[in-house]
Amino acid sequence: MDDDRKKALGAALGQIEKQFGKGAVMRMGDARAVRGDVKSISTGSLALDVALGIGGLPRGRVVEIYGPESSGKTTLTLHIIAEAQKAGGAAAFVDAEHALDPDYAEAVGVDINDLLVSQPDTGEQALEIADMLVRSGGLDVVVVDSVAALTPKAEIEGEMGDSHVGLQARLMSQALRKLTGSIQRSNTLVVFINQIRMKIGVMFGSPETTTGGNALKFYSSVRMDIRRLGAIKKGDEVLGNETRVKVVKNKMAPPFKQAEFEILYGEGISREGEIIDMGVAQGFVDKSGAWYSYNGDRIGQGKDNARQFLRNNPQIAADIEARIREKVLGTALPEAEPTEDAASDTEQKSGKGS
């Protein structure tokens, strides 16, 4: 580029910076240096973290989780919240369905005393609350459950049989246009849970679609389709569900990968079961007949006994998981970045100690 053009560009950049602030325009290499690598928050499922390619869900992005009823959508989001809290982060749950069970959330591992919960009356109120929470910059995860329950105010105030074509789609489109910038700036992971509906008269292809129009499909960096495969039984007693998640869209890594795991009633995702399955697949756990062994020591006969052994010995479970992550992802367990409040607390403590 010649000197005159460089001067003209420099003057334009200076004017933009003066009017819109520092960092309004920057060279892509500088932007990458400022933002660094995309941080992730674990999903609570080792297999799903691997399928996502970056060890979890990306911070500063929109994620959609959809599937049929009782497929494990809310359970998965509660695990995401629990993982963020374990790493010192904070989370909020916008419960538009008014169906969140605090006892189950606690059983899954969520610190309910540290979880912000909102049960809004209208879709506009729900999305406005989500926007304000994201803009605060103090949260790591915001979950909206669910898009289908975000009822526009006009529909709530109208008569039961009134037609309100496209209201919800317009609401979602407007909200996502407003939210996207603040989500990226605050580095908050925003998860939308969605339901499935059937399109009428579809001859070819899948008749399934998600609610709320197409905006969420476009704005989401990751979309996950979660399905119940079958029941986990011990004799006649049903203990939980076998679940499959397909990553149908992924802007962070190659898409269309799948993960299978067990969701146990009253407990959530069976992490020990995943560690055993993936440990065997990666060669860290030996399986001979019904016996499972690790480092030459037998850890149980049958998967249930091996799972119980890992529950009783969390350090061994953590060691196997760390080795699996190191081999498959080349990383350790992902951590959520501390919030601004947590960072200031740490600085104050270090100041007192010095």
From Swiss-Prot:
Chain segments annotated as transmembrane: none
One Pfam family, short name: RecA_C
Database matches in PROSITE patterns: RECA_1, RECA_2, RECA_3
Tree of life domain: Bacteria
CDD domains xrefs: RecA
Binding site for ATP: G67, P68, E69, S70, S71, G72, K73, T74
Alphabetical list of InterPro entries matching this protein: AAA+_ATPase, DNA_recomb/repair_RecA, DNA_recomb/repair_RecA_CS, P-loop_NTPase, RecA-like_C, RecA-like_N, RecA_ATP-bd, RecA_C_sf
Gene Ontology biological-process entries: DNA recombination; DNA repair; SOS response
Metal-binding listed as a keyword: no
Presence of the UniProt keyword DNA-binding in the record: yes
Gene Ontology CC, one term: cytosol
Subcellular location: Cytoplasm
Keywords: ATP-binding, Cytoplasm, DNA damage, DNA recombination, DNA repair, DNA-binding, Nucleotide-binding, SOS response
Residue ranges, annotated region (Disordered): 329-354
Gene Ontology molecular function: ATP binding; ATP hydrolysis activity; ATP-dependent DNA damage sensor activity; damaged DNA binding; single-stranded DNA binding
Major subcellular site: cytoplasm
Gene3D superfamilies, alphabetized: P-loop containing nucleotide triphosphate hydrolases (3.40.50.300)
Entries under SUPFAM superfamilies matching the protein: P-loop containing nucleoside triphosphate hydrolases, RecA protein, C-terminal domain
Similarity comment: family membership: Belongs to the RecA family.
Protein name: Protein RecA
Organism for this UniProt entry: Halorhodospira halophila (strain DSM 244 / SL1) (Ectothiorhodospira halophila (strain DSM 244 / SL1))
Lineage: Bacteria, Pseudomonadati, Pseudomonadota, Gammaproteobacteria, Chromatiales
